[in-house]
Every structure is written in structure tokens, then in C-alpha cells.
Amino acid sequence: MFARGSRRRRSGRAPPEAEDPARGQPCNSCREQCPGFLLHGWRKICQHCKCPREEHAVRTVPVDLERIMCRLISDFQRHSISDDDSGCASEEYAWVPPGLKPEQVYQFFSCLPEDKVPYVNSPGEKYRIKQLLHQLPPHDSEAQYCTALEEEEKKELRAFSQQRKRENLGRATVRIFPVTITGAICEECGKQIGGGDIAVFASRAGLGACWHPQCFVCTTCQELLVDLIYFYHAGKVYCGRHHAECLRPRCQACDEIIFSPECTEAEGRHWHMGHFCCFECEASLGGQRYVMRQSRPHCCACYEARHAEYCDGCGEHIGLDQGQMAYEGQHWHASDRCFCCSRCSRPLLGRPFLPRRGLIFCSRACSLGSETTAPGPGRRSWSAGTVTTPLTTSTASFSATEGTSETASKGTCTKAEPAAGPEEPSHFLRGAPHRHSMPELGLRSAPEPPTESPGHPAPHPDDNAFGRQSTPRVSFRDPLVSEGGPRRTLSAPPAQRRRPRSPPPRTPSCHHHHHHRRRRQRHRRRGSHHHHHHPGRHGHHRCDLGSGSDSGSCSSSPSSPSSESSEDDGFFLGERIPLPPHLCRPRTTQDTSTETFNSPAQPLVQESHPVMPRQTRDKNCIVA
């Protein structure tokens, strides 16, 4: 992180190509397509394949980079990155953690993936060199590895490097976790690190912070921190590259930190003012149209010449201003001439098509090579519309404007439209559900209203709530509280309402009255509210619970569940149950004189049952 030592060494530095150990090395990504690494004039990439330096087969760590690394850790470690106490670094491993015994070194590397263990002349050693070049860029620390920096920018770079080293840089240590301690939690995965396990400790993160060896990775790229060198910032560990990007923007062209007061920003990335140019021809793109490909800007001419798609219909380039259709790696111009059936040339824009062996067809008949036939009633009916407006956007799907067509379908309907004519009435067209047809709602089915007769007047329209209407509608209402006639409301408290009441007097003269009233109650529960007029019968009056006579001037309400049982209300095993004292009142002469049913002023009992022999009552009773 320090500047180079003397001005004389800096001025007498040879060109980068003469001392670059990566020059001529093959590219690991392009293989034989790249003739060898050749550093670009100001980009940190190869001039041939456009790949970065670390993608090429660099066999050894550059000397300058190793010196920079030594200075980076000079305040933390007195030895170099290859010094250790194991004695096996030069024999088996290209690098080992310092201060470990041989058995501890094996224990540490056993926690890492096999392809990342830095054995000598192994993929792990190549991985280490690649990560050194990527995670610790030399141009982030010293100005001599940068291009065209102003004096003010060089001062800012030196101050930037010293600040990072002073506040963020650190090198982790590896040691066995003490057995006497109960254990710790890994800062990355959150799992337990037990006593006797190998652990990585970072002093910048605090005394208790530790990681599993395989968990000590950069927060941004999730790669192992090479040689345990880390930068601690805001409670997280970073590699050198991504920590610098947390503080300053990085130019996407030259890969250097931007210290100039002005820069270009596009699509969340940054460039130096003079570096925002075409990736191929390096023409300036300031105020020009460009295409971003793999985070690299291209001018329109270079993009069409190098990366534009070829049309599978005509074989020509698909321009940037031309719409295109794409399907599973195939591309067509968004025109009727190119995107059409390969046999009958029927336009397919906005219509379904059948791909077969790299070609597209309008129907199965065309795909099989037979003559096309007109669509029948059971076939797909294909629209004959055409595209009337040109498409100017390059997207995968288009909404084409279709002309007049006899069918309203776009190839998705498999049945012809019904012929025009008088509509046949359907049984289900007006089949809106009624309340009486929904037993799941807890409602009873309403019977059909009886035929009107001179002696039975028609019911009121509001009384029949379940009757059919001319325009049925679905109407969900709460279930009715009472299924019978008007509900009788008692003024007594609920506890008193549940007590049995005294029965009415059972006289032969009342049998006909009671039988008629029971039948009328059934009609009321079925929704029929006809008033039966019988000559010689007394009118029905409301029962008064306050009469309290033992002869039974009051009966149970119509909603009582025991109104139709074999046992009379107020009787148990044939014996009358007396009323409680608070419901009884002294009988007067007037009350006694009104207990006979021959008096026209006496209200009739609302509901009672005919007199039954005691033997019958005894047989049908149920002892609770």
C-alpha cells in the first residue's frame, strides 16, 4: 500500500511488456483461440482475446506483486508470505498459514475444497495466483501501475492506500480452538466451532470473532481470502478489490479507482471521462447510441458486425432498429416475409406455429409435407390477418395488429362458432339457486302453496319467503330463527321459561279444540298461514302466563320442543307437576269463574293434546 521507494527506479522502469511474466501465456478461457497474452495499452486485459490477466496461465507470482504483498503485511507479520514453521511449504504446498505445525497444516487444508488446496504444480496453485492478481490489484496501491494519473490524483491514491492499511487491512491467523472453552459461533455460517477444531481469527473483527477455514471468504465475491489477507469494513471482511470499491468507484475500462472529480456513470457502473468508449473500436460514446453487452459498451456498428443475430429466414443480419422474433436460439425478422410457414409461406406473426427440425410451420399438415387443407369444424381455425404496422423493438413477443377475419380466433379455438339464430331456452340459463334448494344453508324446503279455495283466502305475499319469483336471484340470508308462526315472546327470565308449567284441564269437550289447534300449528310450521273459520268455535287469544291458575289457563308456546310428545306438558308419569311458588298467585272468585271453556270471554289454550289413557302415557314416557 506504500508508494515505490525512489524516483530513479520509477523513471528507469522498463516497459510493462518486457518484464510481464504473463506475456505469451495461453488463455484458460479461450484456449487455442488466443495466441498468447499481450497487455493492452491502458486496459488491464489481453489485446487478443479481451480476457483479463488472471485468466491466462501465469505460472508464478509476479515479483512486483509479491513485494507489494510483503509490504502490505509488514506491520502484521515480520516474515514473508512463504515463511512458516512447518518446513513443508517448499516441498508440498506453494503456501501455508504461518505458525502452524505440520499436522495442523494438514488439518487446515483438509477443510478446503480439493481444487483450492495450493499443492505445488496443481490447479490449487493456479487458483491461488489467479486470486492474488484479482483480489489484490497492484494499481489499487501504487501509482506506477496506473495510467495517466494527474499529480493530484497520485496524492489521493497514496492517501487512500495508507488509510486502508491503517484502518482496514489485516492478516488472519490460524490456530486450534482451545478445548477448555465451550466453543464459538462462526461469523459466516453461524454454526458451532468446538474445542479442538481449527479456526481462523481476525484481530480487526475483535477477540471473539472466528471463522471456519472454508468460511473465511469475501463478503462480495464469496471467494476464499487469498493468503488470509482481508480488509475489515462495517463489520464484514472483504478482499482488497471489493473493499476499495466500497469506498471509491472503479472504472470499468481501465480497472483503476477513480480519483478525478468527474466521471461517467451508466447503468450503475462508472468510467473515467475519456474511457467511456466502444469496447471494440474505442470510439467515444459520449452523446452517442450504444449497446451494453456483458457490461461493456459497444457502438452500433461494432455490435451489428460482431454480435448481431442472423435471421433464420433470409440469412441477413437483424439490425438494432429491426424487430426480431426469437425461439429457442433461433431468430427471425419480425416480418411476414421471414417469420412465416416454411412450406406454404403463410405469415405467422401473432399466430401459433409448430416448430419441427429447426423450421416453423402453420399446421401439422405442412409439417408432415402433405397438402394444406381448409380448417374444418374439428380443426384449429387459423386467422388470416396480416401485420399492418412495422415493429421497431427487439423483443421476444409481439402484439401484431390483425386485419378483418371471418373467425374471431387466433388459432386457439378448436370449435366453430354456433350458427346465428333464435336462442334455444336453456334449462340452466336461469337456474339461479333458491333458498329452498340449498339444504347446506340449514334451511327447510318450502312446500308449494295450496290451491286457493273460497274458504281459504290467499296468503299474503310477504308471508311466503321461499316462494319462486319471476326473476330469481341468489340471496344469502341468515337462517330463520323460528320455522313456525309468529314467535311468542315471554317476559319471564330465561331460567323461568325453562321450568315446566301446569297443564290445561283435560275435559272431553276440549278434545276437538285441541286436535284442531295441533293441525293448524302444523300448517303454520309448513309456511301456510290460512285462517280456518269454524262456526261455533271460540276465537284464539294470547296466553297470559300471569294468570297462574292450576287449571291451566296457559299452555306451552308453539316453539316448545315437547309440544308433540306423547306426554302432556306439566305432567310426569301421569302426575301433574305443580308450579313453583313464585309463579302461583292466590286464586280469586273471578279467576275460578273463568276457568270453564263454555264462557265466551275465556281465552282458548294455544296448544294442547287430547286426553290419553294413563296406560298409554305410561308406555310412551321416557325417564330422564
UniProtKB/Swiss-Prot annotation:
CDD domains membership: LIM1_Prickle (cd09415), LIM2_Prickle (cd09418), LIM3_Prickle (cd09420), PET_Prickle (cd09827)
Composition skew (Pro residues), residue ranges: 447-458
Segments for region (Disordered): 1-26, 371-617
Disulphide-bonded residues: none
Domain of life: Eukaryota
Domain LIM zinc-binding: 184-249, 250-309, 310-373
Membrane topology of the entry: Peripheral membrane protein
Skewed-composition ranges (Polar residues): 587-601
Subunit structure, interactors included: Interacts with VANGL2 via its C-terminus. The VANGL2-dependent membrane recruitment of PRICKLE3 is a prerequisite for its polarization. Interacts with WTIP. WTIP is involved in the recruitment of PRICKLE3 to the basal body. Interacts with MT-ATP8, a component of the mitochondrial complex V.
Descriptive protein name: Prickle planar cell polarity protein 3
Gene responsible for this protein: Prickle3
